[in-house]
Amino acid sequence: MKSLIRPLVVLFVVLNAVTGLAYPAVMTVFGQAVFPSQANGSLIEQNGKVVGSALIGQPFDAPKYFWGRLSATAPMPYNAAGSGGSNLGPLNPSLADQVKARIAALRDAGTDLSKPVPVDLVTASASGLDPEITPAAAAYQVERVAKARNLTPDAVAQLVAANTTGRQFGVLGEPRVNVLKLNLALDAAQAAH
């Protein structure tokens, strides 16, 4: 029995040193050297001040801004510490109520509801933190945002196109629009206008 204790203790110490110290240290140094922005949270700065992250959505509800996906996090929207979906099933009345409330908010903000509403504007993502919407969801909001900002719909649509990211490597994922980046571009365009 005593002959087993020493190898077990040595193995425990070596594995802790490798997996608890060496590997995290090497990955941290590698991340900072090769991908510094991503390793630090993909933070977005404006005028030297951090205004958000490209990875975590933010609540926008003013008519002059594009709106992102709903957040299912509690106790506040887009709470990274509370990441997770609502887990509401398709037949759950609460999900139907949330969808109806979001459609009403879109209508109250002046969005034309004569066209079908893109699903990502009325449902939460699996994480509850999704910072991106589909180009269709952005296009759906162009008229409302243009009217609220006294810009032409074409000018706003051009900003949407400029802020649309295609598929990764041309095949992975779907085209998407980062809502925070688009709204910051809108603010900059209106300031220059």
Curated annotation (Swiss-Prot):
Membrane spanning residue stretches: 7-27
GO cellular component, one term: plasma membrane
Coiled coil: none
Main location: membrane
Topology in the lipid bilayer: Single-pass membrane protein
GO molecular function term, any single one: P-type potassium transmembrane transporter activity
Record-linked InterPro entries: KdpC
UniProt keywords, alphabetically: ATP-binding, Cell inner membrane, Cell membrane, Ion transport, Membrane, Nucleotide-binding, Potassium, Potassium transport, Transmembrane, Transmembrane helix, Transport
Localisation per UniProt entry: Cell inner membrane
Role description: Part of the high-affinity ATP-driven potassium transport (or Kdp) system, which catalyzes the hydrolysis of ATP coupled with the electrogenic transport of potassium into the cytoplasm. This subunit acts as a catalytic chaperone that increases the ATP-binding affinity of the ATP-hydrolyzing subunit KdpB by the formation of a transient KdpB/KdpC/ATP ternary complex.
Similarity section: Belongs to the KdpC family.
Subunit structure: The system is composed of three essential subunits: KdpA, KdpB and KdpC.
Name this polypeptide is given: Potassium-transporting ATPase KdpC subunit
Organism name: Burkholderia cenocepacia (strain HI2424)
